[in-house]
Amino acid sequence: MLTEPELPPDINRMSSKRPASPYGEADGEVAMATSRQKMEDEGSDGLPAFHLPLHVGFPSKPHSEEFQAVSLLTQESCDRRSPSYQLNSMELDCNKMSAFALHNVATSPMKAEEVGRQSGDSLSNSMLGTPERRKGSLADVVDTLKQRKMEELIKSEPEETPTIEKLLSKDWKDKLLAMGSGNLADVKGTPESLAEKERQLMTMINQLTSLREQLLAAHDEQKKLAASQIEKQRQQMELAKQQQEQIARQQQQLLQQQHKINLLQQQIQVQGQLPPLMIPVFPPDQRTLAAAAAAQQGFLIPPGFSYKPGCSDPYPLQLIPTTMAAAAAATPGLAPLQLQQLYAAQLAAMQVSPGAKLPGVPQNNLSNSISPSSVHTDKSTSSPPPKSKDDVAQPLNLSAKPKGSDSRSSSSPTSPHIQRLSSGSTHKPISSTSASTPIRLNSIDILSSLTSPGYLNDHDAVTKAIHEARQMKEQLRREQQALDGKVVNSLGLNNCRTEKDKSSLDALTQQLTGKPNEDKFSHAMMDFNLSGDSDGSAGISESRIYREARGRGSNEPHIKRPMNAFMVWAKDERRKILQAFPDMHNSNISKILGSRWKSMTNLEKQPYYEEQARLSKQHLEKYPDYKYKPRPKRTCLVDGKKLRIGEYKAIMRSRRQGQQTQIPISTAGVVYPGAIAMAGMPSPHLPSEHSSVSSSPEPGMPVIQSTYGIKQEELHIKEEIRGDNINGEMYDEYDEEDDPDIDYGSDSENPSATQAN
């Protein structure tokens, strides 16, 4: 008798576990129910029923074969009822089970211990032939069959073939799989075939190695190409950056050059617009000394001029200062105000009538030789020359004696000086009579004494004379302010009907006054020398009109203000209104445009605000240092009261209408010197409809002055400026002819009509 081998406890513990099937349980449950039904039918005959734990279902064909085998086995066991036959059958089953176990060990090495346990159980069951033992042995047989079927199914499952298996031959792959499954005995082949397979495998390995090297080389090339592209891009970016920096430097240099050019142009304009400082004729023995003194004091000597003592050329020496700085260097003790007053005094000396006798001037200084400038002035009566910078900068000779001065009266309307005024020549003196006041004659005496040769090298005397001239000027100014409120019947101003007359008056004002160099003295000044009453008694009244040059210095060019949204819109609208109504005044047009603009919606105004932003940006790029300097509103001083232009015009209109019927008949044929001086000229800054029809006397003309750049003692006017600026609105509705010189062109600015918010 065989004894049951001792098994480890681990194996016994593992034997109680049955493998779970990876497949569904539907077919297994059907098979189990069928087998149970058959067992119960057979158990009714007195046979023991075998309950097979078929929990795993297989595909149809393997399951049917297995079930048939199990059915045959149970049938045979039921037919043979003898104990001996049962024992033999159990031994046969044990042998079969052992064979199955051996095959299972060959196919699945990992289940050797379990197979040993099953064989031990089968041996113990053979020793004990009880129905329970037989039932357990049948269950083990069924489990073994199921395990075998599972192994076959696992082998038959399609596996994902790796990449290397695609490159191998089919027979070699089958042999590898057979070797991997443990069937070493099934591998068939000779050493030659094995060597061939090994050679093929080495060839394949070499091919894979070469392919790997090619891939690595291609990857390296791609890396190098990408690195080269990145380097090229970096170089291009650096080159573009350098080009941008170079362009920026060039633009900066261009801006600097443009700035220098603008400064030079401003200096040239200042030099061309300064009135010349004139020094009279010197005797031949003093020319060398005068040239040396002029060279030391910064004067410009005309090139090619001979300074030999024996030189007797007919043209006198004329010394011209190049700039205001040269004149200041010539007289270092003078302030800018004194230099300006010196120029004004010389201009006043030029305006003396030819018939007036100048006391204090030596008679030998009035030479009979005529300078080219005076000849040119006399020729201007018949053929006036064109205006240019050279003509403006050409000096006058005070020592030249005009022709026919004794035979003609200063009050004659056919005086050549009146023709000079109307012809637009550069030299337009304003005449005066011999009945001038002693104050005016004294100032002229001082100014004429400055022209004597003795004062050339005597700096103290020149300074003293200039100081006296300044005192005379201040005294005249105080007297004029005292006489502002009085009515003077000796003033006669012609009508101002055309724009041509206005332009000629502006040209006359610029030529007579010049343009000073300092900003605080930037306003122009015109002096009208009036004398004589209706009865011939001596009297004087001086009226001044101060005009402000848009709040900037003479050396600074005017920069137009960028148009705002209203001006952009009003440019075309104004043109349309003028086409429909050519005679409509600008003030009425501005009022109409202002009311229309206020009635527009924000959506309608939007494109004009966008255009304003574009123009502002363009203006800022073109003029980065631009600063808006508005022109203050003008005021009038009438009888010691400050009045606006509209109020002044209303007062003058009422006075003129009340006095037109009171003109004496005896004065109808009297021509006043003031009227002679302004014959053919428009009245400055007076509207045409407000001037008198004839040269009738008019009440005292007040001082019309700008409130910008006034002297320090006139603080009350500055307070009015601040009040006017506070009251500024977006649309300044001014009276008629309030600002007649405003340019209403499409490209010009209109600071008085519209104020920016």
Swiss-Prot record:
Single GO BP term: positive regulation of chondrocyte differentiation
Compositional bias annotation for Polar residues: 119-128, 362-375, 420-436
A Pfam cross-reference name: HMG_box
Region Disordered: start-end pairs: 1-48, 113-137, 359-436, 719-757
Domain of life, source organism: Eukaryota
PROSITE patterns: HMG_BOX_2
Summary of the tissues where the protein is detected: Expressed in migrating myoblasts during ventral body wall formation.
SUPFAM superfamilies in the cross-refs: HMG-box (SSF47095)
Ranges in a coiled coil: 457-489
Example of a GO MF term: DNA-binding transcription factor activity, RNA polymerase II-specific
Keywords: Coiled coil, Differentiation, DNA-binding, Nucleus, Transcription, Transcription regulation
Protein name: Transcription factor Sox-5
Ranges of Acidic residues composition bias in the record: 730-746
Cited SMART domains: HMG
Main localization category: nucleus
GO cellular component: nucleus
Subcellular location: Nucleus
Function: Transcription factor involved in chondrocytes differentiation and cartilage formation. Specifically binds the 5'-AACAAT-3' DNA motif present in enhancers and super-enhancers and promotes expression of genes important for chondrogenesis. Required for overt chondrogenesis when condensed prechondrocytes differentiate into early stage chondrocytes: sox5 and sox6 cooperatively bind with sox9 on active enhancers and super-enhancers associated with cartilage-specific genes, and thereby potentiate sox9's ability to transactivate.
DNA-binding region: 559-627
